[in-house]
Structures are given as structure tokens and as C-alpha cells.
Amino acid sequence: MGGCVSTSSKSTCSSWSNGEKPVRRPYLGIGCCVSKRAKRTFSDHIVSLQNLTSIPNRITSSSKSRSSCIFTQQGRKGINQDAMIVWEDFMSEDVTFCGVFDGHGPYGHLVARKVRDTLPVKLQFFFQTLQSKQNCSKGTRFRRNSSKSAVQEAVKEGSDEDKLKGLWGEAFLKSFKAMDKELRSHPNLDCFCSGSTGVTILKQGSNLFMGNIGDSRAILGSKDSNDSMVATQLTVDLKPDLPREAERIKRCKGRVFAMEDEPEVPRVWLPYDDAPGLAMARAFGDFCLKEYGVISVPEFTHRVLTDRDQFIVLASDGVWDVLSNEEVVDIVASATSRASAARTLVNSAAREWKLKYPTSKMDDCAVVCLFLDGKMDSESDYDEQGFSSATNAVESDDGQRSEPCLQRNFTVRSSSDQENETYGNVNTETDAEDEKTVGDQNWLGLQGVTRVNSLVQLPRFSEEKSKT
């Protein structure tokens, strides 16, 4: 991936001083190279992205790894717009990166997959850059100060855990910002009215770092004092009606309100047009709303894991629409095998969709289950034949299958007799009834009407409205 990446949790860092040999110092469990000769450049990103498919311990399609399993199933709304990733040995042996990305809009599936592939590389790059700068600054300061005063200053700076939190926090912020900037300037991907959520976690030893935008969610399954499983929500669903989110959007002249036929779903609208109706306050892409309060700044949190913590579940809102946190934890904990936990959870969500909302179209579902003890089942019951045929029909994560690129429709709900009218290109590989829409959180059955995360109607910037 460029630079010096340790293959051990006890990695070291090198620095040159007056032509002497490199002095190696352990620092925060992740190795880096502070020599100017080994400084990473943007070209390293290109090389990294080109070699993604050959990286070991990185999975992006329904499968399992040493300590995790992932599964996705296409809903009844067109091409699967969900993407997911588990990357073990991420920079070092004790680091694991996981993420779920739920796309929305005409090209949401392409945005979600672009973020899935690029964001981890950017996160790695910014962490190593920040770590190198901090180590160089630390080395200069120690040479200038006496030994006693240097030690005292190091104590004042705080523990390694605090430093680690600060580094990862800044790396998450910078990588999310850089990811959104790359989407804005992408020559072949129209993100004006398309975007993606992003719930990501990074586990390093007992430290858990989380960066989240949108309404995908991460939860923690733990044992209480009675050895009963309990659920803890790790991230906040960043909806437009949250006070701090609504305040920011309104301050930027955006509007937040719900439609009459779905009063429980607040949406973000342009100042002078009832478009695009985004059902979240933060997202990658969606540049038509970036000047009106929608941001790509992640909510970053840190948690120290304990021996009672058993597993972490990341999922798109297709799961959370029909299952509670407690139900998800119970389903994963009671799965016949760890390798099949993600698939079992998606199948349970699919059944709930049919029972609770028989007239509604099921949303895409994507699940990542990370088991914190690092163990999986010895038997392999997660073969390819167990996967949904719908999943296989749309997955092209590794570039082995081509899909109809930029072929996703979107639905504009304008009147009762045009509820399912579609605009854009038609995907010939799906049934005509499969409108290309994406569901959002807490969906109520609406007599078969599909609810979408973004009511993508091209904005009409009329002068008459701007004057009123």
C-alpha cells in the first residue's frame, strides 16, 4: 500500500538523524516510515486501488473471513445499491476495517462501490501521514529538550490511547472529506443527485473507532452480568429531524419537512424547489444539497471493548426498517454457525418485510458481522450455493461480472396515479415491476408504494420562485 506497513502489532517506526542508521521506536501499534525517501504520494493511491482485488484478507462480496461474515441480498427495487467490506490485517495484524455503504439516487450503486473501494485506502494514507508528522515533531522536540523535561512533556501529552484516538479521529475526518471531494470531481460518475451512506468501524486491539454518515447503523452485542445478550447502538442515525442536523440545514437555507403521505420521514429539500427530498442529513455525494446543509463530515466516536463484548453488526437500513437492535443481536447470537450469521440475519429481515409490509417492496439488505474473539466455525457451511440468486445477479465487486453501468432508474412521486412512474434508463435484466428506488428507515406500509431515500426530481431554478 506504499510506505512501511508493519506485519506485526508490535511494529516500529524509523527516522534518520545526522546520517546515522534508522532509529526504531514502537508507536501506537502501527508501523510507519518517516524517512522522506519513503514518503507516500498520491501515486501510491493509484497503485493501491489497482491492486485491491489481490489484497489478502479483504472481502467485499457475500463470504466469510477469519473473524467475520458478510452477506447482501437485492431487494425488489432494482439493482442492489448496497456495498460492504471487511479488511483484516488493515495496516497491521491487529487492525480490522469494516464498512457498509447504502447508495441512493440514479447512480447510488456506483457511488456506494466507489466509496467502499477508495475510502479505506484514503483512511490508511491519512493515518500514516499524520503519524509520521507527529513522530517527526516528537523527535525534534526530544532532541532540543533535556531528557528530564522531555519525559515530563510526554507525560503531559497524555496516554497512547488518547494519541491514538486523536490520530484516528483526524484521519477519519480527512479521509471522508477527501472521498467526497473525489466524488465531486469524478469525470464519469454523476453524484449531483446520487450519493451513499457510510457506517465504518476500525478495530485496533481493544480500541474501536467509528466514523458514520447517513442512516446505516452499527450495534454491539454483549453479555451482561447474567450472561444474557444485550444490544448497544454504536452509531446515530443521522436523520434531518435531529435538532443539530435540522438547525444546520435551515441555517444554510435548506428546508426540512415530511411529505403528507409519509409524515414520519423528514427530508431535505432545496430552498425554492420540492426536490430532491433526501431522507438523511449527511451523505457522500448529493452535491445538489451540499450548499444547503447536507455534509459529509462523519460523526466520530471511540469505545474501549471488554471481554463481555461478543460481536459487532453493521447493516443498511433494509435491516433496521424491520428489525430492532435487540432482535438483530438475538438472531446473530442464535445462528447455527458464525459463518452463516450474516445470511441468517438477512433472511430474517426478508421474512419480516413480507410479514409486516406485504404490499411494500423489500429494500436491499447488507450485513457485516465481526466476531470480537477472532474465531469462526471450523466447518465451512457458507458455500456459494447458499447465496441468493438475486445477489449473484447483481454483484460485480471484483470486476468479474459486468453490470448495466449507469442503468438505475429513480422514482418521482408526483400524484396518486403516478406513484410508480419511473424516469431514466430501464434495466433489462430485471422485471418491469422492479422500480429503481431505495427505502429509508422506519418505513410504514404505503399500499405498495415504494419509499425512496431521495425523491430525485431535477431541480427547477425558476426566477419567479427565487423572487418570492
From Swiss-Prot:
Cofactor: Mg(2+); Mn(2+)
EC number: 3.1.3.16
Positions bound to Mn(2+) 1: D102, G103
GO cellular component assignments: plasma membrane
Domain named PPM-type phosphatase: residues: 67-372
Stretches for region Disordered: 413-442
Cofactor: how bound: Binds 2 magnesium or manganese ions per subunit.
A biological process from GO: protein dephosphorylation
GO MF annotations, alphabetized: metal ion binding; phosphoprotein phosphatase activity; protein serine/threonine phosphatase activity
Keyword Signal in record: no
Pfam families named among the record's database cross-references: PP2C
Residue positions binding Mn(2+) 2: D102, D317, D363
Family: Belongs to the PP2C family.
Protein known as: Probable protein phosphatase 2C 52
